[in-house]
Each structure stands twice: as structure tokens, then as C-alpha cells.
């Protein structure tokens, strides 16, 4: 049984592959139970974002069986996963989780959202009843390390994120956003960040579209924006110079036909679109239209690279914190290996004690002198407790196993052999 981290991310897999194995928030709980039943795991958690899908597990499962389970569950070609996955076990898995939670493995170095997403993965697994003591301990150490990275380094400073990159790209297309209208589809954390960055750049008009009007209004009110339903997008799409979408929809929300109609009403004035969602919210064919500039999360990488240089030095410090955290984790894991031995020792000693106590009770019931019974009990306990260790130590001495002899002296705080000789002299 060991800790396992299996996944794909923006470095190992294309957007096409990532969206095939992405899990929506409503799918994760049932997937967790299916993984326990079908992949030979005793504990499991799933992290699924626009840039990665990862399984954190504790069990005896092999890489091939885990990949096979994921391929079958998501109904994808197993060869695609075999070519694009990564797998870590034991300490390497813990180290990877620490890097992910700290933002060191993100598309945007140091991006803060990933820690909240990992905490959500932990909470969902715990609620589903598939998170045991092993994964719980790992996650707590991971969260502790990530918190230190945030508080002790500047890795979270400077507004660099997918949301910021999307707005930066919009500024490159439209030099002055004060004359433009932006349609934001979704109402989650990423869209909220997009709205904040656009507002800071003085965007003329913001429209927020969501499946529920209440959620759209909740976000819109923060920025003086207009709120609409997803179903109303076709009526308002022509107003938007900028469209940025990030929802959890499993199907595209904007198709080529709807965008063509909007362009006609705009008299083919160009539209800038960024699809941050995985799976995609905007059909890929929309990018074929002459007056549309469509970008996906993969296209944002160049923009992000330009804005992350200031975090490189902080990342080096973060790596040192992670190494320190990993050492603590490994020490804790080594300590756990002694638990079974200590438990077995106590059980053995308890059994011997009960045997001798029973003999003493019977002697007292037969009228024996209590003082003699106590003396016999103490002598018997000493002999019983030390009989097997003494036999083993004699054999160790005969075999020249000095390490065992030194270990026993350390365990019982006995004087060294030289000290014992000095005392006799």
C-alpha cells in the first residue's frame, strides 16, 4: 500500500485530451466511489481544473490498472492516456502534491486558485467517505506547506493568472478598453478575477451571463455590470467586443451559427474571444470566422510566460520550503512504521501480565501470604518479560550482532559495556 499521484496536465496533454478526462463538480463524487470499487484503491481524491486532472490515492493499485480505469470511466482511448500521463508514488507523490498546491506546477507560476481547488478536492473526498487517515495526513501536510509558501515568499504577488492573461491579451487586441463592451460567461472565481481586471482597466461595459440569474446578479453588482441568463446570450452577443467564458458546462454554449449572426448585426466589427473552460464553452469552428479572434487556455501560455518572470526567484525559495515540508512528511511516515510494532509489543506484554495476575488471584484465594504472592508476581513478570529478549540477545552476542546489543542499550537507557566494566572495577 502506498501513496499514488496520477494525472495529466497542460505540460503533458493537449486541450483535446484534457477535456476528455475532465470532471465537473457534479461528477466527482460518483467517480470517487467508482475508483474505489474498480481501481483497487482504499482512499482517493480527484482534482480537476482547466489545466489538469489528477487522482491522489492510497492503495496497492498499479499504474496500468489506474490508467485503464480512468480510460474506461471517461470512455477515452487508453493509448492517449498512456502517452500523456505522469505517475508518482510515496514521497515523490507527496512532493508533487506540495508543488501543485503551492502553484509551482501551474500554467501560471504561483497562481493562488489552485490551493482552493485542492482544498475542495479534499473536502469532496471526505464528504464522499473515501478519504481515510493516510490521505488526510498527506493533505494536511500539503496545505501547511502551501500556506508557508504563500506567507513566506512573493510567489503570489503581481496579478499573474489565466484571468489576467486573458485581459492582457484583450489589451493587445484593443489598445483602449474604455470604449469596449465585455461579455463574461460564468460566475465562478476565474470570471470574477476577469471582471476585476477588466474593471481596473476601465472597461466601458460589462455583461455577466450565467445559468441562474441570481448568481449572475451577485457578480454583476460588484462591478456595476448587467446580468443576463445563458439562454439570453444570442440576443446580446452582438453587443460584445470581448467574450470571455469559463463555465463547467459539458457541452459548448456558443456555436459558429450564433456567432455568425452576431457578426452580421455588428456589421462584421471584430470580436475577441477567450475560452478558458475545459471542456470548451465555444466551438472550435468559431475560430474559423474571419472577424473572430478566438483563444483557448493553451493559447494564453505565451502571454503568461511574459508575466511570470518576477516569480522565478520566489519559486526557488518555495522549492526549499517544499523540501523541508517533505522531510517532515517522510519523518512522520517513518514514525508510523513503528506503530504496529509498539502495538504488538503492548499486546504481548498485556497477555503475559494477565496470565501472571490470574495465577496470583488464585494463590490469594487459596490463602497464600499476600506479601509472598506480590514478590512472586513481580519475579514472574520480570522473568516472563525478559525471557525472550534475553534469549535473542545471547544469540546476537554469539553471532557478533553488536548493532542489536547497542540498540537494546539505547532502548532501555542502559550503560555502555565500557561503563559497566568501569563501575565493577
From Swiss-Prot:
Residue positions binding NADP(+): 186-191
Listed GO MF terms: glutamyl-tRNA reductase activity; NADP binding
Transmembrane segments: none
Pathway: Porphyrin-containing compound metabolism; protoporphyrin-IX biosynthesis; 5-aminolevulinate from L-glutamyl-tRNA(Glu): step 1/2
InterPro entries reported in the protein's UniProt record: 4pyrrol_synth_GluRdtase, 4pyrrol_synth_GluRdtase_dimer, 4pyrrol_synth_GluRdtase_N, GluRdtase_CS, GluRdtase_dimer_dom_sf, GluRdtase_N_sf, NAD(P)-bd_dom_sf, Shikm_DH/Glu-tRNA_Rdtase
Disulfide bond is among the record's keywords: no
Sequence positions that bind substrate: 49-52, 106, 111-113, 117
Keyword field: NADP, Oxidoreductase, Porphyrin biosynthesis
Protein family: Belongs to the glutamyl-tRNA reductase family.
More info: During catalysis, the active site Cys acts as a nucleophile attacking the alpha-carbonyl group of tRNA-bound glutamate with the formation of a thioester intermediate between enzyme and glutamate, and the concomitant release of tRNA(Glu). The thioester intermediate is finally reduced by direct hydride transfer from NADPH, to form the product GSA.
Protein name: Glutamyl-tRNA reductase
Amino acid at each position: 500500500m502506498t501513496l499514488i499521484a496520477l494525472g495529466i496536465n497542460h505540460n503533458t496533454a493537449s486541450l483535446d485530451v484534457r477535456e476528455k478526462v475532465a470532471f465537473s463538480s457534479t461528477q466527482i463524487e460518483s467517480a470517487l466511489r467508482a475508483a474505489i470499487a474498480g481501481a483497487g484503491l482504499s482512499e482517493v481524491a480527484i482534482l480537476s481544473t482547466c489545466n489538469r486532472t489528477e487522482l491522489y490515492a492510497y492503495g496497492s493499485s498499479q499504474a496500468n490498472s489506474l490508467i485503464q480505469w480512468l480510460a474506461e470511466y471517461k470512455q477515452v482511448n487508453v493509448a492517449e492516456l498512456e502517452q500523456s500521463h505522469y505517475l508518482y508514488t510515496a514521497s515523490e507523490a507527496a512532493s508533487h502534491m506540495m508543488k501543485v498546491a503551492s502553484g509551482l506546477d501551474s500554467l501560471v507560476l504561483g497562481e493562488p486558485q489552485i490551493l482552493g481547488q485542492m482544498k475542495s478536492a479534499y473536502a469532496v473526498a471526505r464528504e464522499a467517505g473515501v478519504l481515510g487517515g493516510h490521505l488526510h495526513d498527506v493533505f494536511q501536510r500539503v496545505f501547511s506547506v502551501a500556506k508557508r509558501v504563500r506567507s513566506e515568499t512573493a510567489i503570489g504577488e503581481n496579478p499573474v493568472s489565466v484571468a489576467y492573461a486573458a485581459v492582457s491579451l484583450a489589451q493587445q487586441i484593443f489598445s483602449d478598453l474604455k470604449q469596449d463592451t465585455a461579455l463574461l460567461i460564468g460566475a465562478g472565481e476565474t470570471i470574477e478575477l476577469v471582471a476585476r481586471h477588466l474593471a481596473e482597466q476601465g472597461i466601458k461595459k460589462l455583461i455577466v451571463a450565467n445559468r441562474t440569474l441570481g448568481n449572475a446578479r451577485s457578480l454583476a453588482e460588484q462591478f456595476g455590470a448587467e446580468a443576463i441568463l445563458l439562454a439570453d446570450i444570442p440576443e446580446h452577443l452582438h453587443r460584445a467586443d470581448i467574450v470571455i467564458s469559463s463555465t463547467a458546462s459539458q457541452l459548448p454554449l456558443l456555436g459558429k451559427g450564433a456567432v455568425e449572426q452576431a457578426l452580421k448585426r455588428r456589421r462584421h466589427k471584430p470580436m475577441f474571444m477567450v475560452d478558458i473552460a475545459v471542456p470548451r464553452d465555444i466551438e472550435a469552428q468559431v475560430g474559423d470566422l474571419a472577424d473572430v479572434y478566438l483563444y483557448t487556455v493553451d493559447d494564453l501560455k505565451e502571454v503568461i510566460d511574459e508575466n511570470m518572470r518576477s516569480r522565478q526567484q520566489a519559486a526557488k525559495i518555495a522549492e526549499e520550503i517544499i523540501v523541508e515540508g517533505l522531510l517532515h512528511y517522510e519523518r512522520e511516515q517513518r514514525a508510523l512504521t513503528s506503530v504496529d510494532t509498539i502495538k504488538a509489543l503492548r499486546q504481548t506484554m498485556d497477555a503475559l501480565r494477565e496470565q501472571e495476575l490470574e495465577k496470583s488471584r488464585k494463590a490469594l484465594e487459596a490463602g497464600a501470604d499476600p506479601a509472598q504472592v506480590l514478590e512472586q508476581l513481580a519475579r514472574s513478570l520480570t522473568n516472563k518479560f525478559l525471557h525472550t529478549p534475553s534469549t535473542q540477545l545471547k544469540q546476537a552476542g554469539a553471532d557478533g550482532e553488536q548493532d542489536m546489543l547497542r540498540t537494546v542499550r539505547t532502548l532501555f537507557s542502559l550503560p555502555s559495556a565500557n561503563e559497566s566494566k568501569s563501575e565493577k572495577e
